[in-house]
Amino acid sequence: MTSVLLGGFTAVFLALAPTGALAEARFEKWIKTFYPEAAKAGITAQTYNAAFAGITSPDPDVLQKAQYQPEFTTQIWDYLDSRVNPYTVKMGKEAAAKNMRSLQNIEKYFGVDRNILMAIWSMESNYGAVLSKTEKLHYVPQALATLAYADPKRAGYAKKQLIAALKIIQAGDIKPSEMTGSWAGAMGHTQFIPTSYLIYGVDADGNGKRDIWHSVPDALATAANLLHKNGWENGRTWGYEVVAPGRAGSLAGKTKTIAEWEKLGFRRPGDRGFKFKDERATLKMPAGEGGPAFLLTKNFYVIKRYNASDNYALGVGMLADQLGGSTGLVQSWPRPEGALDAKEKFEIQSRLKALGYYSGEVDGNLGSGSKTAIEAFMKRKGLNGEPEPSKTLLQHLRR
């Protein structure tokens, strides 16, 4: 048997983790001692060595990123503003047109709405744009080894995913050097973790490999396969925005048939009707009685098999609806006084770009590029205060 890879590891680690030579020795020992567990799962020494060749340290960013998951920590209106907006709709329609034949074939074979698949692609990798930003990607075996070594809460998960990742490499679906993904090991256009890839991966383009990194058809078909196998009901929606009767908050979380909800006074905005009156739906009021209300059907919970966050599933459903021609929510979120809404965020970016301060995409995401532009604008105008987007800033931009 080929000897298992042993190498020097220079650890650049977070607080509470060992540093310097001690971290190097401990991580090196972990890599060595994990091999027997991988071997029991059928991983050869050749595959193991190839996967860890050139790895000289744990991934220093993984544990930091593990502390922040926006779908669970961001206010729902901010989360949705950045993911369901005119930019993501425009880009989605363009991407769908480029991949229409594949989408038609996938929709026909798996019985999953193409707009849902496009929305997932957007939410997961911005229609693949994230995959070209190498500075944001992680080498999956290294990221998972880092979690297994240094994150006790996620060690079991990481070990299971690492073995699955090694199986993917061993099967020849992807070269080790090309197995990139998120800090948690989510991979490719549609961000599948390794175990889910092994269960649901599809070779849709017929080249003999399930390649969700380079093949859009493979990635979208793999997403469709997951939804299909978890009970997606073709021809039915994920849910409805509804106008609730007064004092409906006590009903939040209850499940009834659509017909029963109608009898209680729930209706769709614009008095549009419900298609399936016998369908069961759960009332959700994510921001309480002061915000939008939704009746969520079985397909909403199928989307949650992809990502367990309600915010995520709501974003997928809302974006899919707008890709299909919907105009979006009728009711407004109860934003704090002075908070920007989605249109105002777009306007700030648009005006900064028109004035020559901002050169990026007008996508409503007021990130570091936008803040640099705001700082330059404020300096030029002699404005005091922090370079943050605000209604006051927008007033200055409008002058």
Annotate the PLM regions.
Residues 48-72, 121-125, 135-142, 241-246, ...:
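Acidic helix-start/capping segments at beta-turn-to-alpha-helix junctions
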Residues 32-48, 53-60, 108-111, 122-129, ...:
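Sec-exported extracytoplasmic/periplasmic mature domains
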Residues 24-109:
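An acidic, Gly/Ser/Thr/Pro-rich helix-cap/linker signature
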Residues 176, 180-305, 313, 331-332:
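Flexible, glycine-rich surface segments
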